[in-house]
Regions:
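Domain-level signal for Mg2+-assisted phosphodiester chemistry and nucleotide/NA-binding surfaces
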Residues: 1-97, 140, 149
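Nuclease catalytic cores that cleave nucleic-acid phosphodiester bonds
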Residues: 62-190
Length: 190
C-alpha cells in the first residue's frame, strides 16, 4: 500500500497568471490546486498559499487594486491561504516583490508542518537556492511552470518539474474559444 505524501503548495500569483495568459488562458486556481495535490496520486494537500502583489493604494492604481482585492477575497473564500505584499509605485507601474516573503514562508512552514513535498508554482530562478535548501532538509521539491517562464537554475535545483501546459489546456480561453496551445510534447522538460 502506498503511503500518502503531505504536500505544501506555494504559488507566485503574478508569475502563474502571466504564464496562463501567455497561452490565452484564464487562471483557474481550483483546477490547479486539484492537479498539484491529486489524492489519487497519494497526495494530501496540507496548504496552498498564494502570494499576491498588491498595487499601491494610490489613485493611479485604483482599478488594479480593486481587481487584486477581489481576487484575494475570492481565494480566501475558496480555501486558499493568501499572503498579500504591498507594492511600491515606480512611475506608472508598481513592484510588489513577493519572492522574499514566499521564500521565508517556505522555510518556516516546512519546519512547522513537515511536508513530504513542496511545490513551487513559479518559474523564477530567484527560488533556486530555496529549492536546494529544502532538498537538503529531505523535502522533495517540485516546480510547476511552463518552459517559457522556467529559469534554468530553478529547473536544475528542483527534484522534478511539473509541466503546466496540460493543465492550462483545461482552463477556459480568455476569448471563450476552445483553443489548444501545446508547445513541444508532454515530456518537454526531459
Amino acid at each position: 500500500m502506498n503511503q500518502t505524501r503531505k504536500v505544501l503548495v506555494l504559488a507566485d500569483s503574478d508569475n502563474t497568471r502571466i504564464a496562463a495568459q501567455s497561452f490565452n488562458r484564464k487562471m483557474d486556481w481550483e483546477k490547479l490546486r486539484n492537479y498539484l495535490a491529486n489524492p489519487e496520486e497519494g497526495r494530501e494537500l496540507i496548504e496552498m498559499v498564494i502570494y499576491v502583489g498588491m498595487p499601491p493604494a494610490k489613485e493611479r492604481f485604483v482599478e488594479q487594486r480593486k481587481f487584486t482585492e477581489k481576487f484575494s477575497y475570492w481565494a480566501k473564500s475558496n480555501g486558499f491561504m493568501v499572503v498579500e505584499q504591498e507594492g511600491k509605485a515606480k512611475g506608472n507601474e508598481y513592484q510588489a516583490d513577493v519572492d522574499v516573503v514566499m521564500a521565508m514562508d517556505a522555510i518556516e512552514l516546512s519546519l512547522e508542518i513537515k511536508p513530504d513535498i513542496v511545490v513551487l508554482v513559479t518559474g523564477d530562478s530567484d527560488f533556486a537556492h530555496l529549492a536546494q535548501k529544502l532538498r537538503r532538509r529531505g523535502i522533495r521539491v517540485e516546480v510547476a511552470s511552463v518552459e517559457q517562464s522556467l529559469g534554468k537554475d530553478l529547473k536544475n535545483s528542483a527534484n522534478s518539474v511539473i509541466d503546466l501546459i496540460s493543465i492550462f489546456d483545461e482552463f477556459r480561453s480568455k476569448n471563450g474559444r476552445k483553443e489548444h496551445f501545446r508547445i513541444g510534447h508532454t515530456n518537454v522538460f526531459d
